[in-house]
């Protein structure tokens, strides 16, 4: 059987959603410790569920939802986002400005691929969700972290950005 090597594009990519940090957390759970696992970004295990209205809408539309949506996303969802933007007095948001996706991971990846050229620097807060750093690196960007300190209510340190 032919052996496949990982791409060198992954050499500088760290993604601790899996790997040694998760392995250590699992070991701690096995030792009887309580570990709050926030590494996947799934709110459901923490008691956050979709509102009943959304669940009912999903159920009533399941028969008509068996294909691909428009590449920008479902029209009614995009319209609702535009209307919400208007309610919040966010100027100049039009339907053509709004894209939806299958979750934030897909959209972060699309944005990084579309906006970063090789060697472009991108400011990313630290601590960060590792997907930001991983996708920026894979897109050819050079990640520059700036500190958000808990003692400062997580506000960024402007001097650190310079």
Walk through the language-model features, giving the residues of each.
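Residue-level detector of flexible, active-site-proximal loop/helix-junction positions
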Residues: 42, 75, 105, 129, ...
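Long, low-complexity, intrinsically disordered polar/charged segments
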Residues: 1-8, 116-121
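PLP-dependent aminotransferase-like
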Residues: 96, 114-162
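Alpha-helical elements of the RecA-like P-loop NTPase motor core of helicases
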Residues: 79, 109, 130-134
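N-terminal small-domain helix-loop-helix segment of the aminotransferase-like
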Residues: 2-5, 11-103, 110, 157
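Residue-level signal for pocket-adjacent positions within structured domains
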Residues: 5-8, 63, 142, 149-151
